[in-house]
Amino acid sequence: MVKVIASSVRKGNVLDVDGKLYVVLTAQNFHPGKGTPVTQVDMRRIVDGVKVSERWRTTEQVERAFVEDVNFQYLYEDGEGFHFMNPANYDQVVVSQETMGDQKAYLQEGMTCILSIHEGIPLALELPRHVTLEIVETEPVVKGQTASSSYKPAMLSNGIRTSVPPHIDAGTRVVIATEDNSYVERAKD
C-alpha cells in the first residue's frame, strides 16, 4: 500500500479504505472561495459492487493499493462476461459486467486495453483514449450554418450519441474520445 494525497486520486485508481478495496469511478477537486479545498470521490467496493461517495481534504492521506496495469487484448463477450487475453503469455481473464460498466460500448474485437489487476483479479479497465467508429445517422445540414462553432447530433455505430461538424455525413468513419464521447477528427483510414 502506498499513501498518496487525496488530490492526486484519479479515475481507475484502487484505494484501500478501512481494509476494503474500492475502484475510483470519479474524482473531483473543489476549491471553494472560503474554506479548505476538498476532493469528492465516487467509488465502487470491489467485493460486492456497492457504490460509495467520500469527501477528503485535498491534503489528507489515502492508501492506494498496489495494482498491476497489464495490456490485454479483447476477445469476445458471452454470458460469463468479457474475455481478454494477455498477448505476452496468452493467459485469459474474464471481466464482469459490473467491472466493465458503460465502457462496453467502445469494445472492439482485438482492441488492446489496460487491465488493472490486484492479486490476480481484474478490478478496472482502461480503454484507449480514442476509438474509430462509423456514423450511422446524422441530421441534414441547415444551409447558412457556419463550420466553426456549430455541431450537429449524430448516432455512432455503437449506439452512442455525439456531436459532429456539419460536413460529416452518415457512413463516415470518425475518431471519438472514449472519456467524454466527443468528436476528435475524421478517421484517416
From Swiss-Prot:
Q: What Gene Ontology biological process does one annotation of this record name?
A: peptide biosynthetic process
Classification via Pfam families? EFP, EFP_N, Elong-fact-P_C
Q: Which GO terms describe its cellular component?
A: cytoplasm
Q: Which UniProt keywords apply?
A: Cytoplasm, Elongation factor, Protein biosynthesis
**Gene Ontology terms for molecular function:** translation elongation factor activity
Pathways per UniProt: Protein biosynthesis; polypeptide chain elongation
* Compartmental location: Cytoplasm
The family note in this entry says: Belongs to the elongation factor P family.
- What exactly does this protein do? Involved in peptide bond synthesis. Stimulates efficient translation and peptide-bond synthesis on native or reconstituted 70S ribosomes in vitro. Probably functions indirectly by altering the affinity of the ribosome for aminoacyl-tRNA, thus increasing their reactivity as acceptors for peptidyl transferase.
State what protein this is by name: Elongation factor P
Source organism of this protein record: Rhizobium etli (strain CIAT 652)
